[in-house]
Amino acid sequence: MTEEIIYLGKEELKQLMQTKLEKAGLQETHAKEVANHLTYADLRGVHSHGAVRVEYYSERIAKGGTTVTPDFKFEKTGPSTGVFHADNAIGHVAAKEALSYGMEMAKETGVGIVGVSKMGHSGMLSYYVDIAAQNDLVALAVCQSDPMAVPFGGTEPFFGTNPIAFSAPTNNERPIIFDMATTVQAWGKILDARSKNLPIPNTWAVDKQGEPTTDANQVNGLLPISGPKGYGLMMMVDVLSGSLLGLPFGKHVTSMYSDLSTGRNLGQLFILINPSYFTNLEVFKDNLSEMIKELHENQPATGFEQVYYPGELSEIKQAENEANGIPVAQSIYDYLLSDEVHYNRYDHSDAFAEK
C-alpha cells in the first residue's frame, strides 16, 4: 500500500527542515543552506535528495559524524587549481564554499578546477552547476560515493553511484542543466521508493543473489547505466573525485551508514570554464538558446508529446510544485513536526540502510 502524500509550500518545508537540522546540532547558517539545497531538490522532483534525507543527516550530526564548526581551508595549488579542505563538514555547505573559489578562478583565468577533500554527503550536484551557469560559466561536477554498484560482469558492489552534472548558460530564462548517476538510478530514488512503499523497475538493481529485483527493500547492488559504458564512467568519476585528491577509491570509500560517529572523507571535483575565453559570450548563449529551440522543433516519436532538452522536465516540475505545493510522504512530514531529532535507524547499517 502506498503512503499518503501531503503538499507543502516551499518556505514551510524549508523551515521545517532547517529547524530539525539545527536541533540536531548544525549551526544556523549551515542548516539554512542545507534546507535550501534540499528544498531545491524536492521542488525539481528529485525527492531522493530532498526531505527524505533529513533524518539521516540529523542522526549523523547528533552522533558527531559531521563537523559542526569546521575549519575550512582553501589551498590554491596553481593559477586555476585548488583544493578545498572541508574538515568533514556537511557536504552541501563545503561544496558551495569550494564552488565559489572555482568560479572566481574561472572568471580570472578562464578555467577553475577545485577539488573538495574530506567532506560529508553533498546532495544534488545540479544545485552547484546551476549556480555556476547563473554566473555565465560552463560547469562539470563529479562526486564519489560509497560502494553500492556492481561492476559490469560482477556480483559484488565496488563503485558508488558516482554522479556527473553539467550546466551551460543560455539567453533563455534558465540554463541547460544535466545531472545523472552513473547507475541506472541513484540510490536515493530507491530510498524514496522505500519511503512510499512503491516497487522499482527490475532494471535498476539486483538482490543478494545477483538477480533483478522490484522490491526496494531487497536491493543489494545497483546496475551501471548501459553496462560497460556506465561502468567506465563511474570509474572515471572515482578517479577524478577520489584518487586525484588522495582519497580512498571504490570499495574503500566509507559507507553512508556504517559509523555515523565519524567523518566520511568524501571527495568532489568542480571543473568551471569561462566561455568568454573561447568565444563571444553572448554568441555562445545565443547558440545554445537556438539549440534548445531546434530541439523543441524536432518531430517527436510515437508516444512522446515533445522533445525536451536535458534537464527541462525538472524545470517543468519545479514550476508545477511551486504552484501546487511540494509532495512529501506523510511519515516524513510527521518526523519533521516531531520533537525527535532522529529515530536511531541508520547507524551501523549496510550501504543499503539495512541492519
Model region roles, listed by residue range:
Residues 187-249, 258, 263:
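Small-residue-enriched flexible segments
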Residues 4-8, 13, 23, 249-355:
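Catalytic-core signal marking the mid-to-C-terminal active-site face
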Residues 50-103:
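Active-site cofactor/substrate anionic-group-binding motifs, chiefly glycine-
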Residues 136-148, 242-256:
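Glycine-rich phosphate/pyrophosphate-binding loops
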Residues 149-216:
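Phosphate/diphosphate-binding glycine-rich loops and adjacent basic-rich segments that engage nucleotide
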Residues 81-171:
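A generic, well-ordered mixed alpha/beta core segment in the N-terminal half of proteins
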Residues 8-10, 26-50, 66-77, 261-265:
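N-terminal glycine-rich anion-binding loops that anchor highly charged ligand groups
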